[in-house]
Amino acid sequence: MTRGIDLIEEVARHYGYDKFPPRLPPAKQPAHRLPHAEAQDRLRERIVALGYQEIVEIPIVDTQRNELFRPENLAPAVIGNPLAEDASVMRSTGTVSMLRAIEWNLNHGQRNLRLFEIGKTYELRDGAPIETQVLTLGATGMAQEKTIYEAAREFGFADLKGDLDRIGELAGGFAWQSGGPQWLAGSRAAQIALAAKSPDSANLGTTGQLAKRIADIYKFRQDVFVAELKLEPLVTGVEAANAARRFKPLPRFPAVERDFSLVLADGVAFAQVDAAIRSLQIAELESIEAADLFRGGQIPAGKFSLMIRVKFQSAEATFTDAQLNDISARIVAALQEKLGATLRAI
């Protein structure tokens, strides 16, 4: 015996190890939550409430699959001694892992999937590995199975966009712009930013339907939709929106809706219409919705008709016709000036 612990060991051995109660030693450091843990919990709760299941994927992926989604400006983080050919690089995007999970489930008979993952992506920058946390969503299959009450309906881009809007409500809302990376279908792809302007809000992520050439590589026989968002600016937006939240009393006066049937040039997005109206900073503005879209008939070629429904709510008094007419005139003037819109009817 050379140390005090040796004597303790001998005493314990003679006394009998089986006689010591099975207790863990007390923790010497207080437990603490990681940064943004509460905001991440709120995101998880919202996504699960929307019907998604959380997955945890291995971040080591196949090089060829990773190259399908790797942005050209990101250098891949290649593993020096890979255990297998299909596990030779750290993933550059969360999408490649999400599609692997969807592929496995489809091959095993699971046709209706709503999945999400919070995990890291990897790249090399100046020879050093960089890790970025992302939120990835994937969905495919039926949005509504056939019942005696409802007809069957496949999950579509509008369903995913609606789910993302619900998630974005936690961060003050999302701003949308059409288009996305080449692995998404051009007509069903969008870029997402936080509605609240900040240095990190401009390029939050992308979403859309998987392009046909990518779906063919995976041998998908049904439409697959994905979304990938940077987690750091998203949770920061959740925290900022939560801090700015204030109590709002229930309205005492009725809300009023006005419909505007507009004729717009092809290529004008609803997001532009929404932004043009909101730029007027009408205090009583409650919501703007796209109610109907029409092409053909008396609508000239190269144009389309969009009916929007605008809701107003005053906390001080019931609207008069004069007030509504004044607000409506301002909206029409703004749409004419900024988007070249013409009004069919109010």
Please provide the spans of the model-predicted regions:
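Extended, well-folded interaction surfaces typified by the phenylalanyl-tRNA synthetase beta subunit core
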Residues: 1-113, 311-313, 319, 323-346
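A carboxyl-terminal module marker
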Residues: 4, 57, 64, 128-130, ...
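Residues forming anionic-ligand binding surfaces in small-molecule and nucleic-acid pockets
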Residues: 14-25, 29, 33, 75-80, ...
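Generic beta-strand hydrophobic packing signal
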Residues: 20, 55, 118, 288-291
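Short, well-ordered loop/turn elements at secondary-structure boundaries
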Residues: 49-51, 73, 112, 131-133, ...
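Structural motif
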Residues: 53-54, 77, 113-114, 136, ...
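Residues that form or immediately flank small-molecule/cofactor binding pockets and catalytic motifs
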Residues: 60, 84, 120-123, 142, ...
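Structured loops at beta-to-helix junctions and adjacent beta-edge loops in soluble globular domains
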Residues: 82, 93, 119-121, 138-140, ...
